[in-house]
Amino acid sequence: MDAETECCKCHLLDLPWEDVLVTHIFCYLPLRQLVRLQRVSKQFYALIQVYLANCRTFDLTQIGPSLPKEAFCNILRDNKVLQNLSVQNCSDWVTDTELLPVIGQNQHLLRVDMRGCDRLTRHSLVAVSLSCTHLQYLGLAHCEWVDSLSIRSLADHCGGLRSIDLTACRQLKDEAICYLSKKCLKMRSLSVAVNANITDVSVEEVAKNCRELEQLDLTGCLRVRNDSIRTVAEYCPKLQSLKVNHCHNVTESSLDPLRKRNVEIDVEPPLQRALVLLQDVVGFAPFINLQI
């Protein structure tokens, strides 16, 4: 009986690698655990390399910020089928040297997140533009190296872009945003927050060209006024969210029509703000010295 049981034993590595382990098992395990599994044996190392070569998503938030650049390059060395790439957690060390080879051999990327990667240059963005023509989402928040020329390249080659985060990309001016909106007509989500260069000119152009727009973030765009918000209300019937906090020239007269359409706005109506202030004053009332 023991001999028969021994013959019937099936070890993990005996299962078909690509058809079973890679496709139906490893896809449910965190990347951190899979990387650790490589250390068990040479066979496990080879197996995990097969998995990594067929991985559709690479997100470093699953591993942590401590991944060395050598490990990053090794993990993605053989992968040519990535669809989602996030290097946000590599911001301390990732440069064009590490990223360009990955971009160059993965032409099916749909989502790329480079937020906060301040050691990259425009060469990485141009590479994304030229290689990833089916790109739908791009995160570039706090990448101050993003300039007008690289955005033009993106607009020319990635017309199907649905969402882009340009928060604090302070080199960009109205001209670049206008050009982007004319080329990427399917845009549904756009952030140009924390950029004092943005004015009504580009906001109105976005509204008129991107009729499918659902989310617009103008936080801290100090030169944006009521006129462009009215244009957004007129041309963007699918708008769901508008952020205008710290836009001091945007008032309730332009926001009220959007509120009536149940658009989520991050600024409270004047009455609500007054009630909050009143509650604060009442809260301090016991401490007020009435003899003053």
Swiss-Prot record:
Ranges of residues in domain F-box: 12-59
A Pfam family recorded for this sequence: F-box
LRR repeats: 134-155, 160-181, 186-207, 212-233, 238-259
Pathway where it operates: Protein modification; protein ubiquitination
Subcellular location: Cytoplasm
Cross-referenced SUPFAM superfamilies: F-box domain, RNI-like
Protein name (record): F-box/LRR-repeat protein 15
Native source species: Salmo salar
Gene: fbxl15
